[in-house]
C-alpha cells in the first residue's frame, strides 16, 4: 500500500476506511494523484476508473443506489468537478448518498491566471447537504508556502515548534470536518462535497501511515418519532389513499401488506418504481385515471375516487395524472411516512411522520379503519380498464406501445430493470412486470442525461443481471457511459429508437411542423450499431413484431459479451396510437 505523505490526503483515505466507504470512483488527473494512488493501492477499496466525470457521477450514483451506502467520487481540479453536477442534483433529490472529493490548487493560485483553476468552493450550492474545504497542511512543502504565502496560512515569524503546533491544529480541524461531513451523508442519504487544496509535490508516498486518526464516530441511527401516535390525524376515515413513490423492494413487510389489503376503506396505489408487487394494490395509475378525464361525468367520478386522508410513502411520484387529480380534488389531510424528505407535491400541506411505515401501520391501523368500502369504485374502474387495455393491445400494430406490451411477459424473472426517463418510464407504468424484478429510474431530477451510466454502476453491485430500457435520445446523450471497463457480460440494453423525442408529440399544444421537429422532437437518423461495436457489445436489431419476438428469444441468453437490442419504431404512428389508447380505455 502507498500512503500519500500529504497529511490531508492520507487522513481522507483513513477516514473512508474507518467509515467503510469502500467503493471509490476515480477520474484521471494530476492534482488528485495523492488520493487516486492512495485509494487504488489499498486492497480494502474497490476502485473504478472512469474518464468522463459526468458519467462517473452517475456510475457512482448507480453503485450507491444498490448498496445504500455512500460511494466516493474523486476528481482533479478545474472544470472536472463541474461535470459531476447533474449526478449530484439527481442524488440530492433521489436521496442517494455520495461523497464528492475534489482536489484543488492552494488558495493563492486561484483567480490569478494559474492553469486548471476555478472557484471550487461550494460549487454545488443547495444540491449538497454539506460542503467543507479542508485546511491546507503546513508541514508539506513548507518552503513553497512561505515563498508564496499569499494566503498567510503561516505567519512569517513562526519557528519550528510553532509550525508543529499549527499542523496539529490543522490535523484536528480536518478530522472534525471529515467526521461531521461523513455523518451528514450517512444520516441524510444525500451527497456531500469535500474540497482539498494540495501543494506540490504530489507524488511522495510511504509504505505505512504516518499519522494516527481519532477513533471517534458519534454516529447514531435514525430513531422513529413515536410522538406521531398522538396526532389528531390518526382517526377513522371513510377513504384513505396510500400512495407509494420510488422505493426499494422490501419497504413494506408481508404482514403489513396483508393487513392493508384487508381494509376496505384503504386503497393502495403503487408505481412501477415502488417495487411493491401485491395484486390487491393498484398499479398502472395513469391507465386508471387518464381515461376518466375524458368522461362527461369526470367530476362525479373523481369525487368518488378522491381520498379524505392521503398517506405518501417513498420518494418521487412519476404519474402526472395522480398529481393532477389530487391537486384538483384535494384530500382533507396529507401525511408522509418515513425518514426521507416529505414533499408538498399536492399543494395541501404535509405532516411529516418520521417513522418506519411498518411500525406506523402496526400501531395505528385499527384507528384508521372504518366500514366504508372505498375500494369498490377503484376495483370497478380497474376491471373496466384491464378489459379495454387487453382488447386494444390485441389489435395494435407494431409501435412503442406494442413493444412494451411484448416486453411485459418476456423479461426474465430476477432482473434489475433500469429505465430511462421521458416516454420510456411512462410506457413502463402501463404494464406489470415480473414481481421478482426490481425497477429503478432516476426520478430525482427526471433527466435523460445519465441513465446508461447509472445502470452500469448499478450492475457492478446488483445481485441480479441488469437490463436498461432506454429511448434513443437518452442513449445517445449518455453514450460515454459505455466507455467503461467494468461492464459485465450479463448487462443488457434495449434501445427503443423512434428517431427523436416522441413523447413531445403527445403533449397538449404540440405542432407537427419543421420547427418542432428540429428543435423539440430533435429528429435524427442515428443507429446504435456502431457504438455497440466500438464498445464491445453484441448488437441485434428488430423492426417488426415477428422480428422482435425472435430477437428477444435469444437476447437474454448467457453470452460472453454484453448486448444491445435496438428496436426501431415509427414515431408518428406510436404517438397517435398512445393518444387513442387512453380514449379507448374510457
Give short role names for the model-derived ranges.
Residues 3, 149-168, 172-237:
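Conformationally flexible catalytic loops at phosphate/diphosphate-handling active centers
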Residues 83, 244-335, 434-463, 476-480, ...:
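Glycine-rich, anion-gripping cofactor-binding loops and their flanking helix/strand elements
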Residues 90, 101, 108-130, 137-147, ...:
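Thiamine diphosphate
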